[in-house]
């Protein structure tokens, strides 16, 4: 259990002027970078973008009206640096562009704790280290902000050198619209470990494998691939929407009695206790740093394993069937 508790912080808990009174350098203009930069600017925050000279995102940021500098120039100019490039790239960007341009009293912000948790980045003393992590992809963060809503977030303080890091984190969260929905305090360790576990065991790895096995089981038994696709993949969104809206209980309330009964008697046989034991092993690899080491080692050597695994996944028959069906039906257009 977390020692922090489960208080939800909202807009009334934050002073927006704190982030409005500093210059923010957003390093990176990808999914989170573009969304957070645009939301901050629309909240009255002064923002510059830090991108390499040959970055494919440079024109997009300039077209959005931002001043675009080299990462080292942006870091030197700003008082808060939001490092929002992908995890594997953060070490090099930090070492080459940020590390020597941090001044005492500056703040370094992340939206995922990976590099701090596993020690790939160690900021100097005298610098605030904080995290604001929206619980949704960048396009959702931007869309919800424009619709006068917000994407929930978690935030964390790793190093409070200034004595105001907590308030600064809430101010930043308010600036990107997260406090409209609410934010929960966590730690870099908790955010990193639970985020990686959720991705690997449930949301991405576990779910994708479950879908593929379900599809293969039906097709191997002689059913049409198109029908199998509908039953194990397409209808998933309908169930997920219900779960997000009202938890597992709303999903059970909304489905037929046949489906509900079947879920009780068959679900635990598909996802049995061995699955939970495997989940515990995966969590152990995350907590020990074994996964991080494997991932970074592969990235540093050219991402050969990652590329091979991606190619294998792309060749699964469900991909071709899905692409063909989505091209035929109006719901995908």
Curated annotation (Swiss-Prot):
A molecular function (GO) term: magnesium ion binding
Residues the entry annotates as binding NADP(+): 29-32, 52, 55, 57, 87-90, 138
Record flagged with keyword Mitochondrion: no
SUPFAM superfamilies assigned: 6-phosphogluconate dehydrogenase C-terminal domain-like, NAD(P)-binding Rossmann-fold domains
Ranges where the KARI C-terminal knotted domain occurs: 187-332
One GO BP: isoleucine biosynthetic process
GO CC terms in record: cytosol
Cofactor: Mg(2+)
Biochemical pathway: Amino-acid biosynthesis; L-isoleucine biosynthesis; L-isoleucine from 2-oxobutanoate: step 2/4; Amino-acid biosynthesis; L-valine biosynthesis; L-valine from pyruvate: step 2/4
Residues given in the record as Mg(2+) 2 binding sites: 195, 231, 235
Active-site annotation: 112
Sequence ranges assigned to domain KARI N-terminal Rossmann in this UniProt record: 6-186
Cofactor details (free text): Binds 2 magnesium ions per subunit.
Xref: InterPro entries: 6-PGluconate_DH-like_C_sf (IPR008927), KARI (IPR013023), KARI_C (IPR000506), KARI_N (IPR013116), KARI_prok (IPR014359), NAD(P)-bd_dom_sf (IPR036291)
Binding-site list for substrate: 256
Name assigned to this protein: Ketol-acid reductoisomerase (NADP(+))
């Amino acid at each position: 259990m977390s020692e922090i508790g489960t208080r939800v912080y909202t807009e009334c808990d934050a002073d927006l002027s704190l982030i409005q009174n500093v210059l923010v350098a957003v390093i990176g203009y990808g999914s989170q970078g573009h969304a957070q930069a645009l939301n901050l600017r629309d909240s009255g925050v002064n923002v510059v973008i830090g991108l390499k000279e040959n970055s494919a995102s440079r024109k997009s940021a300039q077209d959005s009206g931002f001043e675009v500098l080299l990462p080292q120039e942006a870091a030197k100019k700003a008082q808060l640096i939001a490092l929002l490039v992908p995890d594997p790239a953060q070490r090099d960007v930090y070492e080459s562009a940020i590390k020597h341009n941090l001044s005492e009293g500056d703040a370094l912000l992340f939206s995922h704790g990976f590099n701090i948790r596993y020690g790939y980045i160690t900021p100097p003393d005298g610098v605030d280290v904080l995290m604001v992590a929206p619980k949704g992809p960048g396009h959702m963060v931007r869309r919800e902000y424009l619709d006068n809503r917000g994407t929930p977030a978690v935030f964390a303080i790793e190093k409070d050198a200034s004595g105001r890091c907590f308030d600064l984190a809430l101010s930043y969260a308010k600036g990107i619209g997260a406090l409209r929905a609410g934010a929960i305090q966590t730690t870099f360790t908790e955010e990193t470990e639970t985020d990686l576990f959720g991705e690997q065991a449930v949301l991405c790895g576990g779910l994708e494998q479950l879908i593929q096995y379900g599809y293969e089981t039906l097709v191997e038994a002689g059913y049409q691939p198109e029908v199998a696709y509908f039953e194990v993949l397409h209808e998933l969104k309908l169930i997920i929407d219900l779960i997000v809206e009202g938890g597992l209980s709303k999903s059970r309330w909304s489905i037929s009695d046949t489906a509900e009964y079947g879920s009780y008697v068959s679900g635990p046989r598909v996802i049995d206790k061995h699955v939970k034991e495997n989940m515990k092993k995966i969590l152990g690899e995350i907590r020990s740093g074994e996964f991080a080491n494997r991932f970074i080692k592969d990235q540093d050597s050219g991402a050969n394993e990652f590329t091979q695994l991606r190619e294998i996944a792309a060749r699964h028959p469900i991909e071709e069937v899905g692409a063909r069906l989505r091209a035929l039906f109006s719901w995908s257009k």
